[in-house]
Amino acid sequence: MQCPYCQHTDSRVLESRSTGAGRSIRRRRECLSCKHRFTTYERIEFVPISVIKRNGQSEAFDRSKILRGMVRACEKTTVLPSTLEAIAEEIEAQLQQKPKRSITTAQIGDLVLHRLRQESEVAYVRFASVYRQFQGVDDFIETLSHLQDNAEQANLWIQTLNEDEESEDLTSPSVLTPSAN
């Protein structure tokens, strides 16, 4: 490891600790040339997940986008920021475990909706209104009426998504989609 002070390439490890729930290692090092101490972090590098947007374009997965959307949906609710951080981390971990390295924004939205519904129905409806692009009051009314009716269907779809790793069909119809009237 190169010393940030003198750029010498030899250092020794003084201390190592696991951090971030075992996802990274913090190492305290000492340069063998100038004796300065510095800290390095080692973490697993994941194969990037590609997100296919509604317009067909593809971009790298960005967990902060999920978090921003959930924070806006949960404003003035009892859902804690730490809970939202945990949900975003859980969704990212779930996606990292999948053998397929691409997912649609609709599927990510469904995963977020599923978790938000467990935390707050208000946050669920707020997120759904943006994610599903509600056009009017009828879309809200329909979603509210489907909130209880389709709970079982949503849970089954999420369970199928989690279990079906070999023949993963990432074009499953979304649940709770307001119909165009």
UniProtKB/Swiss-Prot annotation:
It comes from the Bacteria. PROSITE patterns: ATP_CONE. Disulfide bonds: none annotated. The keyword Kinase does not apply. Residues 49-139 form the ATP-cone domain. A zinc finger (unnamed) spans 3-34. InterPro entries: ATP-cone_dom (IPR005144), NrdR-like_N (IPR055173), RNR_NrdR-like (IPR003796). Pfam families: ATP-cone (PF03477), Zn_ribbon_NrdR (PF22811). GO terms for biological process: negative regulation of DNA-templated transcription. GO terms for molecular function: ATP binding; DNA binding; zinc ion binding. HAMAP family: NrdR (MF_00440). Belongs to the NrdR family. Negatively regulates transcription of bacterial ribonucleotide reductase nrd genes and operons by binding to NrdR-boxes. This is Transcriptional repressor NrdR. It comes from Picosynechococcus sp. (strain ATCC 27264 / PCC 7002 / PR-6) (Agmenellum quadruplicatum).
